[in-house]
Amino acid sequence: MSSGGRGSAWRDRNVEHFVRSIVKAALSLLVLQAPSTRAQELDHIAVFLEFCTGTRIAEKIVLTAYHCLENRIPKSASGSGVKVKVTDHLISPLAREMKIDVRHDVALLYLEKSLPAEVPIVPLASRGQKFERYVRLGYGFHAGENGWIDSNALGKLKVDEVFFWDKRPSEKGKMRFAQPANRTCPGDSGGPTLGLDNGHWYVAGVTSRVLPDLRHRFSWIVPLIQGKELPDYARYCGEFYTAERVTENLDFLVKGVQTLIARHPEPLLRAAPPRKVTARRRK
């Protein structure tokens, strides 16, 4: 091979290596540097998943809770009035059921096609980011004033500002929020708890479980002793809810997006055939 040929091959390999490194870096930052979501877009952010809720974090990828996929994978995701088929999923390898909650309660769904542009791609919170306020979105059941589910209807969006249950919330582990006016109930699982930073929303948490306080946790003892029918606590929305902290799952979320994109490569666009140009006679 001539020196010119060797030089050309060397340049080609370097160009290929450079392109691959750029693509890899872009994929790694895809989730973290999604376009900011302005405050007025709240009504379009949450994605309905038949029996849970989710958030669009990449072009065809929806973030939800691991426990939403334990028994059955959602068949479709709906946003802005459009239903799209779910074709693949990934569960955090660290996810596991605990006594009263789920650890690393996150999973990803891959859609057959993109949701409408009205459903924004929401960026994930970054480590150390501080928020002015929090809002929880969910398509779950609705509860009455006493906290018990009073309707079996799912699919009606709830948008509520939420506040920490703890007076001094921890910087690590699950976030615990007091119940808002429209209580967090089953069906809200997997939905986002959004944090507001400088006029833009970020996914700070993923709704995990609704839990009762100690008083309600042991309230079944009295009716048990009295021989009365026990309350159906599966229909109770609890005093607070937990949200999986996004910043403790960034490694899985970034690599998970990369994996799903690699599994489903986009077909190359074919060049449109040249149109026939016909000459028109002037009148």
Go through each PLM region and give its residues:
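Sec-dependent signal peptide recognition
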Residues: R20-S28
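Sec/Tat signal peptide C-region and signal peptidase I cleavage site
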Residues: P35-A39
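Catalytic histidine site
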Residues: Q40-S78, L90, L94-E97
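Short conserved beta-strand and strand-loop elements enriched in small hydrophobics
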Residues: A46-F48, I73-V84, F131-G138, G195
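Beta-propeller and closely related beta-sheet repeat lectin domains
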Residues: C52-T53, G190-P192
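C-terminal subregion of chymotrypsin/trypsin-like serine protease catalytic domains
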Residues: I57-L69, L154-K156, F164, L194-K283
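Chymotrypsin/trypsin-fold serine protease catalytic domain
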Residues: R103-V106, Y110-R183, T207-P223, V246-L250, ...
